[in-house]
Amino acid sequence: FGYIKPDVQANKANSPFVIASGKQAALAPYFSQFLLNADQWDGYNGERKALMQHLRSNNIKNVVALTGDIHSFFAGTVNDDFDSVGGGTPTMVDLVTAGMSSDSFFSYLRDAVGSLSTDLATLVYYPISIPTGTPLGTLNITFNLLDYTMGQTAPTLDLLADQARVQVRGALAQAGAPEAQLDVLTEQMLAGLKASPSFNTNLLGLAQQLSGLNSNPWLKYARTDAQGFAVVTLTPGNLSCQFKQVNRLVGNNA
């Protein structure tokens, strides 16, 4: 493996090992680089380095950025030099809130990834069909895997089901479930999901594998498919931030 890995990294889809696998065409998209969003720190690498260097050089500590407008919840650190080995030294804290009514960052990427490559879709979402056993029919949702691809902590089965809660509830509402029954029906659907091998084995295993890539170790929390807001409490000795997720909009109602 010590010989195979460097060759694949250097030659990518043209590596003889990739060619010999018979999967060259299928694997080719995974060697491509895509610019997902330049309107964030990644699009201002020079400015970020300069600002972080200013903070470190002047021994300015306890700096926290409170931002939003990326349609997701994120929490992590901003390092002084992401180009260095290990990604640099943490210099400040970044807390990012989702929006109340905007579509999520995940939804934009989910809609775009199919036109790029269906093979890449597994890095972003996993389609799930949930039979309700009622006149509501079958619910079809696209489960968010982007969080784990970006580095969210590996889930347990309970956490995975809880992540699907808002999406399942929204799908039930769109299917015409009475509002008074939404919470009960959501619990029933989630219980069925947890008992399904496609969820408790296939999806859970895939999410854990993607998380294991450790793509962004400085990112401590990611929820890219959410609407909500943040509540920040600041005292002389402490700052805390609570991310509050709300139910998905149905029509004009949350």
What function would you assign to each model-found segment?
Residues 1-254:
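Long, structured stretches of catalytic cores involved in phosphate-ester chemistry, encompassing
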